[in-house]
Amino acid sequence: MSVFLVRHEHRAEQCPAADFAAGARLLNRLSRTTAARYGVRIRADAVLAAHTLVMIAEADSEDLLRAFLQPFETVGTVEVELASTCARVVAGGGCASSSPVLDATVPALDPEEACQQALDAGLVVHRAHPLNCETPLPALTGGVVMPNARFYVRNHFQIPHLDPAAWRLEVGGLVDRPLSLTLAQVRALPSQSAVATLECAGNGRVGLEPSVPGEQWGVGAVSTAEWTGVALTEVLARAGVKSTAREVVFTAADRGPVEGLDGPIRFERSLSVSQLGSAGALLAYAMNGENLPVLHGYPLRLVVPGWYAVASVKWLTRIELIAQPFRGHFQTDRYHIDGTPVTLQEVRSLVIEPRPGQLVEPGQRVVRGVAWSGAAPICRVEVSIEHGPWQPATLTGEVRRHSWRWWELLARFEGHGDVAVRSRAMDLAGRTQPEQPRWNPLGYANNAIHEVRLTAG
């Protein structure tokens, strides 16, 4: 949905508040329930002067918003201006950049174009078909959210081409009331936003010895965004989950061949019904205040905060409640450790500044990095210089349940030559990064202590 600034003015003799009944009708018009029927969401309203009303509203188009505002036009003037949000400006690179329009149509993305966009954004491309690329460490430096163009990309199959007008979210299986929702209907439901860090389960695979098959991710398959959408539990409550349901299967539109299997398969993952209450899962249609990009699942994706990103199914088309454990390929043959599906992100930290290989002059210098955990908030980060004693770093920024946390330490560098800077994090659940990776055949959940090598002198 696009964000609009609305300004309504009327003359004193036309003031609707002068008539109690007319004023009540306009107040009812501004109610959330009425606005939702018109596909409009009112974020805020204020009276600037005696006869001037200002609103911040969201709608799929200006035409829809003006239809909702028609009663106000009968008693005065209505000006509608396309606006933006702070998250959108930050994600877009600043105030000088053009503001993207959040509408119901996003063009299909050609695979070659997608790869070129990733290269232009400075991402490290591991594979072009399907596109897989990570964010370089220096690009992680900054605020809480990662600009959409620099958000790492993980695909298993080619990017699907979806017509938003024809797209539907089907909810079925063991439910009382099967649903078939259009994108507009999904967006009209009560919305919420969450800042959440997504990390590929294979992040850090390149650090495993002996090496294992799979995309050889460095440590940049992780990014954070503000996701906006509808709570999964809201949609399931409308469908009515039967008491016999045990798992929820999420089916994506992307599909392709898998070695050893007959024919193409779709990407599918599941959550257990018992996990729904604590997962805080969102059906997201916006990312950092703009339309969910095609690369990241437009028109709708699942976001499961705190879990490895394989659970956050992109290009979502169907939700099905089933009575038995789901046995899909990406649930049982991949994304598991010793037979147990990967779920919560392991506690982890990265050294972001100084950069690997950077020349550091003797003396004091700030070491910065980021830390996150799926189980609980980060409570402590420690840094070691050249295998010296562990020193506590200062945690900065706001504490968010499912978002990474920045940290910094004023460290002293002495001598000349190669210097190792290491970081380790702890969370409130008592988990600490291990000294060495926990090797497993598929190369998942490597959260070993991060080390960068610098040159002092």
Tell where the protein language model's regions lie, with residue ranges.
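Short amphipathic alpha-helices in soluble, non-transmembrane regions
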Residues: L65-E73, Q185-V186
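Short active-site oxyanion
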Residues: T52-V54, T77
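Predominantly extracellular/luminal cell-surface or secreted proteins
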Residues: E9, A83, S384-E386
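Conserved short beta-strand edge segments in small beta-sheet-based binding/regulatory domains
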Residues: T74-A87
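Structured, non-membrane catalytic/scaffold regions adjacent to prosthetic-group chemistry
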Residues: V106-G457
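Short glycine-enriched loop/turn motifs at secondary-structure junctions
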Residues: V47-H51, E73, Q216-V219
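Short, flexible, solvent-exposed loop/turn segments with mixed acidic/basic and small polar residues
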Residues: R41-V47, F68-Q70, P160
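Short S/T/G/P-rich N-terminal loop/turn motif that feeds into the first structured element of a domain
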Residues: M1-T52, D60-D63, C86-V101, T105
